[in-house]
Amino acid sequence: MRISIFLLTVFFFSCKEKNQTVALYPLESPKERIEWEIQRLADPVTGNIPNNIRQKELLFAKNLPKSKSFNKSNWLHRGPYNVGGRTRALCLDVLDENTILAGGASGGMFRSTDGGQSWTMTTEPSQEHRISCLTQDRRPGKENVWYFGTGENRGSYVINVSMYGNGIWKSIDGGLSWDSLPITTTNTPTNLDGDFDFMFSLKTDPSNDSLDVVYAATRGDIYRTEDGGNSWSKQLGGPNSNYYQYTDVEVTSNGVVYATISSNCVDNGIWRSSDGQTWKNILPTNFPPGYSRVEIGVSPSNENVVYFIAAETTGYGQYTQTFFNGSTWTSLWKYEYLSGDGTGAGGRWTDLSANIPANYPASFDNFNAQGSYDLLVSVHPTDTNLVIIGGTNLWRSTDGFTTPNNTSIIGGYLAGSKEGHGNWGSYENHHPDQHEILYLPSDDNVMINGNDGGVYKTLNVFKDTVDWISLNNGYNTTQLYVATISKNANSDVMHAGLQDNGNRVTFSSNSNSTWKMPFNGDGMIAGIADNEEDFYLSIQRGVLYKMKLDNTGAATAFQRMDPASCDSTNYRWKNPMTMDSNNDNVLYWSEKNKIWRHNSLNTIPYNNSNNKSNFGWDFFSDSLHVQMDITTLNSSVNPPDILYFGTSSKYMYRIDNASIGDPPKTILTGPPTGSNSFTADIAINPLDADEIICVYSNYSVYSLFHSTDGGQSWEKIAGNLEETPTGSGNGPSCRTALIIPFDNDTLYLVGTTVGLFGTRDLDGPNTIWTQIGFEEFGSTIVEDLSFRQSDNLLVVATYGNGVYQINIPNSNVLLSNNEISLDDMQFNVFPNPTTEVINFSLKTNKDYRWVIYNQLGSIVNQSPTKKGVGNTNEKINISNLKPGLYFISVIIDGKSITNEFIIK
């Protein structure tokens, strides 16, 4: 039941909420988070995360069997209702400003029709969820047409875990449903081989009445379409070998296009075009020679005025000291079009870089784009002096940044924040890391902002101290590390540890209830006492608190409790911890190669202290070698008092009588997997502690092992979750497991980077795992699983769509086989390979329909329901599809059978 994430985000924060006791803790170095990610994901042989593994594993998962025992109504999406995730894509509908579309970086597309008071997810679970940009056709009569782009090059330190997308998607019904534009999808996700794998910006041309013109800022290139995305022509860019290739594009109301391309690319510079086809590089001669991402801000009330903010202009522009001893250079320029093609004397440039916020005594107050991760510039619709630039914070200038004197922080981190425990927080009811700004057409005092915490609104952007309202009301795009439930039967108490959004707690089963945040930072592993008042909450790098919460989840008292004798530099990013499964007074804690135990949690006093304490702690003297790291802990139910723990070097151990004295450890027989494999979880049968499953999370290693004798012997059970018998290939990263015994059988569950899988029948290396919840959370990453046997409550924590729960009285209803057997029905596809048509023959007298998918699971063609006539033959025209591998499924009575075919 221990967890990990897949998609790397390098930046994190801590929040402060109104009317709550909140301990404030600072960010940690991105380097530490990255090292943790690499260790648990990388191929132990090469030390690298396999190239483009996210796309490869999604393709691999397409062929795995799927269970449809439960429909959506059986699953309860618990939330967190009031918390959002990273949001780069955000637009207001020009037909109705109360209709907002927002896309999560890993959570899919959402739509609100009431100004953000509620949201509906409009992408299907099987569709693309990595949304990076969004635009609407604003022309009269065309307003129902929308486009979103996918894939996020986040400026991370680890290339292979950036969020690859797969092209552009289009809606013709106002954003209610979406289909991919086939020409922008590669259908070959084994390589970064498409310009549309990363998308930075999409813009339509509102001035062209005869053509459906859209511009796309992709990885190193600017593209243009005249037919709504059916075909594209490259306007700028070329063959680019660099990974980080940033672009941006903006279009004025009269069709003038501005585009930027980073300095390491072909056609680098700042470009202007009056027709979208003839381009002039207007970059001033004294512009910094080196720059990464350059964002564009057109002044709505005077579109001849354009601002450009450039990140990583090393040696030029404004130098700022950033938090944790970092530094960066940033440049801000204002351009005024005067005449002609805008070059030379046809445009006036003003360097405003010296007025970028810098040299503040509190390092969090200085401008920081975090290596191009968060960057924006925006001009108010009517007041040209109100200009906002965004990085970690929102900085507002009321004189257009012509001086440094009229600038203030209006969002992000709390002004005056600096390094050190208790010295920083977030701006009230807001979140750091800014990505998008919109203004309400009917009232341009109202501004809407998308950032790493979701969507927020202010009613008065001009106010000295800007007040924010969260619009994360069911905008379920949160990214979880862990979910923890009370041990009490039928209890609604639940904890969620969220990336960037702290430790959240709810006492209500209502999916629309507010989840309070008693402890900020990156929420990690937790324990809940049986009284449901005392909570043991941790954040990144091993900071642990005991907190007393009221029945709303608000903290009324606290005490830091991680051992004072521990060396904090030994803690992991997600430091292992587990509460004893039978005794809520006992907690186990790790410090690198050591295990600590607290046997009297209820005696820890609440002194509201932020100081570490040795009170009540003992450590086991039988520690591991100093170079070994403990990565997961789990305790038994029956028999009690057995502690299993795993390491980053594949080895696992067992301690009997773990809660008494100073017991020795026993090394378990090592499963036959590669050395330095990361032990992500050890699942224990609650009725028989000798039955365990070991989960290794690295790619290119065998992932799942099963033992019925307490780890003396092991059997491989990953089965069809591996592409090869050795674990190499494109199988997913396994993260967590559960063993759930019922009266007549046992259910085995595994959370992976491509969803949740289960089986009743372990058959060694031939085990068949079936995907569960495909229609609910699809192939979203499952980080953590929890189960309460007293009422059969299963909780699923996802990275991108929050927390789901379901009561499962037995395994049959959760895991029935809905695949049609080939023995029961004849289904042939021919010719294969093919070019323009595909034929299939079907022997059935029942109603049926067919669906064609590309490799990523996107529907590219489908039929209405038809009547089978015994021997049925169909011919389908597929001439509009690109060459590649496809799948055709025939659905009868809710069951399906699938064949693959290739288009040459």
Each language-model region and where it sits:
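Sec-dependent signal peptide recognition
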Residues: M1-L7
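Short, well-ordered helical secondary-structure segments
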Residues: R2, F364-N366, W424-S426, I485, ...
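C-terminal outer-membrane/trafficking sorting elements
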Residues: F6, I820-F830, T834-K904
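C-terminal motif of bacterial Sec signal peptides marking the signal peptidase cleavage site
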Residues: F13-S14
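Beta-propeller blade termini and top-face loops
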Residues: K18-S811
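Low-complexity, Pro/Thr/Ser/Gly/Ala-rich linker/spacer regions in secreted
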Residues: I808-D824
